[in-house]
Amino acid sequence: MLHKKYRPNVAAIIMSPDYPNACEVFIAERIDIEGAWQFPQGGIDEGETPLEALHRELLEEIGTNEIEILAQYPRWIAYDFPSNMEHKFYSFDGQKQRYFLVRLKHTNNIDLNKHTPEFRAYQFIHLKDLLKRIVPFKRQVYRQVIAYFKREGYL
């Protein structure tokens, strides 16, 4: 059996500032793949903790890291890249991720163009609409992580 190589990564499930009164989650459409909506995520640099990577990635991708951390998924969770995407990520077969559930403090600080843009648009959507909006190869991971946060009473 071949050993798969996964890129260490963090991902943020960003709840709107109205959480817990409203259960709306932030999703963004990738700039390089039209119609590909996802949570903000990104690689963990060498020597960086997952929490440090989370703050850096949010600042880079959505222009703000003014968040309140609500919870963290307790373990790494991995997914494989679709075969047509593998070439983009060098020698990696997929990504292993640490998920953080966070509440955004202010929506007026979101700026997708603050750094090199990775997203073309964003929306806050109701949690029940999430899975039908997300790219198919990430749905199982999203389903598992959301189910965990629901069981723990956060969602």
UniProtKB/Swiss-Prot annotation:
One GO BP annotation of this record: mRNA catabolic process
Keywords linked to the UniProt accession: Hydrolase
Motif (Nudix box): 42-63
Pfam family, one: NUDIX
GO molecular-function terms, A-Z: mRNA 5'-diphosphatase activity
Official protein name in the record: RNA pyrophosphohydrolase
Cofactor(s), by name: a divalent metal cation
High-level lineage: Bacteria, Pseudomonadati, Campylobacterota, Epsilonproteobacteria, Campylobacterales
Family to which the UniProt record says this protein belongs: Belongs to the Nudix hydrolase family. RppH subfamily.
One GO cellular component term noted in the UniProt record for this chain: cytoplasm
Hydrolase listed as a keyword: yes
Gene source species: Helicobacter pylori (strain ATCC 700392 / 26695)
Stretches assigned to the Nudix hydrolase domain: 5-147
